[in-house]
Amino acid sequence: VDFNVPLKEGVVKDPTRIAGSIPSIKKILETNPRGLVLMSHLGRPDGQRVEKHSLKPVLPKLEELLGTKVTFLNDCVGKDVEEAVKSSRNGEIILLENLRFHIEEEGKAVDAAGNKVKADPKAVKEFRKSLTNLGDLFFNDAFGTAHRAHSSMVGVDHKIRVAGYLLKKELEYFSKALESPTLPFCVVLGGAKVKDKIQLINSMLDNVNEMIIGGGMAFTFLKRLHNLEIGNSLFDEEGYKIVDELLEKAKKKNVKIHLPVDFLCGDSLEANANTAIHDLQSGIPKGWIGLDAGPKTIALNAEVIARANTIVWNGPQGRFEVDKFRNGSSDLLKKVIERTKTGATSIIGGGDTVNLVQQEKASNKVSHVSTGGGAS
């Protein structure tokens, strides 16, 4: 399962991912198993036990959603864990501690000195063997990590491996959108760095008709395209090198790229920042940061969404966590909701975008909200 949920002071802040796996868990329990073992990761503890990344705070919310008691174990592998699982009876549900507390889960980590280290292959083999010993059948309902070659994904050696309901639902929505979308197909991309989204941009250019690029990554494109002065806005040096290649592919594939034409800027990232509108002609002065789409860009984005029949959105349009820099993202969401009401298919993915949707209480107003975070 993917219980990698945000915590605040030891309490689950957003239970969406936990709730997403409840139907699969309940279905398995209907078959009267001897026991059910749940394994997940949380955060990035880099192969070490870090208490703030413990899965224990997930327990109360999981018990509440299931309406039954769940046993929590302080580790995920080893003799004690195997014995506890072996002695489970009457459909006992067991939640293991964070898989990523062990370097063998990801195969690599960062040590206390900040050096990158690799796991010992023999230890990885033992880790995977111990995970395998915890059950007879393997169910994968963790869409958010299904793309990773981690031990819990690829190293649990059971002949019968089954996709859970959540994984099935995610794959159905994305395969429909990518393989047989109702055209026009628009993808909206945001976030900070171009290089983090290279694969996504590349693959989407094979499928879409129009692409809106916003958020921090837009400034890297605008710097390359127009030599725009971007002040202190986000700039991705690595991504800058491949902008031409991406735009050339878009041209070949006849994909219309929409970049911001104006920006709401701040002199800091804080809620009390002074703000000003700048555009392609003026550029952004030194000491100022592009933090949201400007009014002209918001209007142009609305036009693109209004003509789309399939919409996939991954990444906000600005620093929406601060109210004054929220308009670009919240207005876009309103337009996506309006278009969904009139028949478009809308899929929202990416952790920040999903957070926006939940804050606006709009999860049931779009076609599908993915649990996959960046994996979406």
From Swiss-Prot:
Protein source organism: Glaucoma chattoni
Gene responsible for this protein: PGK
Chain residues that bind ATP: 192, 197, 216, 290, 321, 352-353
Protein name: Phosphoglycerate kinase
Domain of life according to the entry: Eukaryota
Keyword Kinase: yes
Residues where (2R)-3-phosphoglycerate binds: 1-4, 17, 40-41, 43-44, 99-100, 147-148
Cofactor(s) annotated in UniProt: Mg(2+)
Residues at which Mg(2+) binds: 192, 196, 352
Subunit structure: Monomer.
InterPro entries reported in the protein's UniProt record: Phosphoglycerate_kinase, Phosphoglycerate_kinase_N, Phosphoglycerate_kinase_sf
